[in-house]
Regions:
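Conserved helicase motor
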Residues: 35-44, 117-121
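Glycine/small-residue-rich loop that forms an oxyanion/phosphate-binding "nest" at active or ligand-binding sites
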Residues: 46-95, 99
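Class I SAM-dependent methyltransferase SAM-binding "motif I" and its flanking Rossmann-like core
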Residues: 76-134
Length: 238
């Protein structure tokens, strides 16, 4: 389906037009028109793209790797399309969070995808603190040069948990490194490629049986409210 859409699109919006052109060549697709569309020009290009869609043109949006909008460009455009009633259709493709969850052996549900962690230490600390008591696994992307620093911050804030460092997913050098968050400093400094991190859910203390916590969690979820508030109520109860 993806190939058919790329073959028939009037214009392909691409995070990197060179990589998009290479993809089309590998798929035997010729004569396509491309428009550069990425985080730093999305706002200025949006009206031009919307005009083409209003005229009935068929446009395709692709990212360098993974799925558009999931830590990739496209959110503002898709939101604008929905507000105007312009049709948007997803095309199944590679997604690092889904691939990592399917093979890491860490509880997949519930989970929260955080995208890329903030670059600054204070920002990372604030984000991880906000999600520290949210039930379920946490998933995020991180650069190789910030990985160990981010994991050290996570270990300090989140406490003992399961950890999976997944790199180069679905590629030739795919690797899953399973460890404990508190032991993350044991990781090699030589990890290369695109890295997806999964941190397992908060661990239940011996003082509170898992069944009791799960029962309390179900009751609090039934009460409603934001996930953060539910987590705080459960934490205070146990």
């Amino acid at each position: 389906r993806a190939r058919e859409i790329l073959e028939n699109a009037d214009l392909i919006l691409a995070e990197d037009t060179r990589r998009a052109a290479q993809l089309c060549r590998l798929c035997g697709i010729q004569g396509r028109r491309f428009l550069s569309f990425y985080d730093h020009n999305e706002a200025e290009r949006q009206e031009e793209v919307l005009r083409l869609l209003r005229e009935g043109r068929d446009l395709a949006l692709i990212s360098d790797a993974g799925t558009p909008l999931l830590a990739d460009p496209g959110y503002r455009l898709v939101r604008a399309c929905r507000k105007e009633g312009l049709p948007v259709s997803p095309v199944p493709g590679p997604s690092a969070p889904a691939a990592a969850l399917s093979a890491a052996g860490i509880a997949p549900l519930p989970h929260t995808f955080l995208g890329f962690l903030p670059r600054d230490t204070a920002g990372r600390e604030a984000l991880l603190t906000a999600y520290a008591q949210v039930p379920g696994s946490l998933i995020f992307f991180e650069r190789k040069d910030r990985l160990k620093e981010s994991l050290a911050t996570a270990a300090r804030i989140l406490g003992p948990r399961d950890l999976a460092v997944c790199r180069e997913l679905t590629k030739t050098h795919e690797e899953f490194i399973l460890n404990r968050l508190e032991n993350s400093m044991d990781l090699s400094d030589e990890l290369l490629g695109e890295i997806t991190v999964i941190i397992g859910p908060p661990e239940v203390t011996e003082r509170t049986p898992r069944e009791e916590v799960e029962s309390l969690l179900r009751a609090e979820l039934a009460r409603g409210g934001k996930a953060r508030d539910v987590a705080r109520r459960v934490q205070s109860a146990v």
